[in-house]
């Protein structure tokens, strides 16, 4: 099965971007709660 590189990159970005956004948002709220 031939893998489409653009499809792999698009899927990776589609997963990584929201995940990193939620992670940063969680870290911000956690740091605010600590202080």
From Swiss-Prot:
The keyword Plastid applies. Keywords: Chloroplast, Membrane, Photosynthesis, Photosystem II, Plastid, Reaction center, Thylakoid, Transmembrane, Transmembrane helix. InterPro entries: PSII_PsbM, PSII_PsbM_sf. Pfam families: PsbM (PF05151). The keyword Metal-binding does not apply. It is a single-pass membrane protein. One of its GO terms (cellular component) is photosystem II. It is found in: Plastid, Chloroplast thylakoid membrane. PSII is composed of 1 copy each of membrane proteins PsbA, PsbB, PsbC, PsbD, PsbE, PsbF, PsbH, PsbI, PsbJ, PsbK, PsbL, PsbM, PsbT, PsbX, PsbY, PsbZ, Psb30/Ycf12, at least 3 peripheral proteins of the oxygen-evolving complex and a large number of cofactors. It forms dimeric complexes. This is Photosystem II reaction center protein M. The gene is psbM.
